[in-house]
Amino acid sequence: MSLLTEVETPTRNEWECRCSDSSDPLVVAASIIGILHLILWILDRLFFKCIYRRLKYGLKRGPSTAGVPESMREEYRQEQQSAVDVDDGHFVNIELE
């Protein structure tokens, strides 16, 4: 039941909807779109770092590590992770003289 399209009023027996066109296809479509929008917004807020990292850096896996020692692989992974982990809350102020 959408708060924007229906009005509830107390009656003798129970709460009753006074909206006569609630079965209108336009109202149904608007309700479905509203629910989908809410779900997508919640998912975006929950996973925004993962989503935007994927968009920014793509699905690239990096160069092949065949024949590379494990210590160098770990160092490469740490470099890649530190390049991705950017703290957006801090900005650098540069003053030119």
Curated annotation (Swiss-Prot):
Lineage of source species: Viruses, Riboviria, Orthornavirae, Negarnaviricota, Polyploviricotina
Keywords in alphabetical order: Disulfide bond, Host cell membrane, Host membrane, Host-virus interaction, Hydrogen ion transport, Inhibition of host autophagy by virus, Ion channel, Ion transport, Lipoprotein, Membrane, Palmitate, Phosphoprotein, Signal-anchor, Transmembrane, Transmembrane helix, Transport, Viral ion channel, Virion
All ranges on the Virion surface side of the membrane: 1-22
Top-level taxon in the UniProt lineage: Viruses
This protein's encoding gene: M
PTM-bearing positions, type Phosphoserine: S64, S82
Protein name: Matrix protein 2
Annotated site location: Seems to be involved in pH gating: W41
Coiled coil: none
